[in-house]
UniProtKB/Swiss-Prot annotation:
UniProt-listed Pfam families: V-set
Name of the protein in its database record: Immunoglobulin kappa chain variable 12-41
SMART domains: IG, IGv
Disulfide bond listed as a keyword: yes
Start and end residues of each stretch annotated as Complementarity-determining-1: 44-54
Amino acid sequence: MSVLTQVLALLLLWLTGARCDIQMTQSPASLSASVGETVTITCRASGNIHNYLAWYQQKQGKSPQLLVYNAKTLADGVPSRFSGSGSGTQYSLKINSLQPEDFGSYYCQHFWSTP
């Protein structure tokens, strides 16, 4: 193996490993809201994640459901009262006019390809 090939292989391994260094912090940890209210959940990354962010909703006993990907794009079938925004290290999920079916847990996820 040539020196150039070895260097490229090491660089590729370093770049792949670097992706795992991002830490995500979501707030608030818990939230109390009523039907009709507007709710905003924020997610902060420890480094620029270039809009590679997804939001999920999970109801008790069910699998998480994708709401938003690429920070701002609504997944198919997601009501327009949901919206994602942000860039760089700061992101948010906003739910306008909260509906009974919106109650559950919400999670942000940093990803490196479309979920």
